[in-house]
Amino acid sequence: MEAIKKKMQMLKLDKENALDRAEQAEAEQKQAEERSKQLEDELAAMQKKLKGTEDELDKYSEALKDAQEKLELAEKKAADAEAEVASLNRRIQLVEEELDRAQERLATALQKLEEAEKAADESERGMKVIENRALKDEEKMELQEIQLKEAKHIAEEADRKYEEVARKLVIIEGDLERTEERAELAESKCSELEEELKNVTNNLKSLEAQAEKYSQKEDKYEEEIKILTDKLKEAETRAEFAERSVAKLEKTIDDLEDELYAQKLKYKAISEELDHALNDMTSI
């Protein structure tokens, strides 16, 4: 009887233990269900977050593509600007060479002009000498005319001195003829010198016109150089702006790459956490 009671107590104890284990199993099952539901909620949230991350990744990919296109466009603009600068440099060099040649021609023209001015001065001095000689000849002619008048007066007053006066008159007339010939020669020489002076003056005017033409051409070259210089400055500004744009785009790309790398790490961490959750669910 004692053995039966003892066995009953043991059975009762086993029953209580079984009930405790059943309650504990139910509690664990309930906890497992709650944990499973929590994991399912977390999984749904992670899937939603993962979808948002994928959308954001697509957006970043599109932004990266746009940035790359802008970078290529900026590189093309910078290359075009550099090519334009090189072309302008070549044009400026050609203009400078042409300007040097024009300055050389202008210097030659100025030298010829100076020589022509010297020749004109010499011609003017020669004309003054001729004028002085002609003036002296005229004075001499006037003196001879006075002498001729005196001789005629003496011939009228004294017939006895007729022969002597006639002889003197012949001499004076001969001198007068020679003087007239010299005067005519001086006048002819003066005409020649006037013609030469006229030619020198025309040459001088031609050289002055040519010098004025060179001066206008030089002003034109200076204006072209100024225009090319302004274009060069504009091209340099465009090139600098393109370089700044490229630097800005490179920084934007670097930032996007850093953010993309961070999102990849975040995605990897979420994937690992999701794998752990799935493993926990599988083990339960």
Swiss-Prot record:
Residues 1-284 form a coiled coil. The keyword Heme does not apply. The keyword Secreted does not apply. The modification Phosphothreonine is found at T53, T108, T252, T282. The modification Phosphoserine is found at S61, S87, S206, S215, S271, S283. Residues 12-40 have a biased composition (Basic and acidic residues). Homodimer. Heterodimer of an alpha (TPM1, TPM3 or TPM4) and a beta (TPM2) chain. Interacts with TMOD1. Interacts with TNNT1. This is Tropomyosin alpha-3 chain.
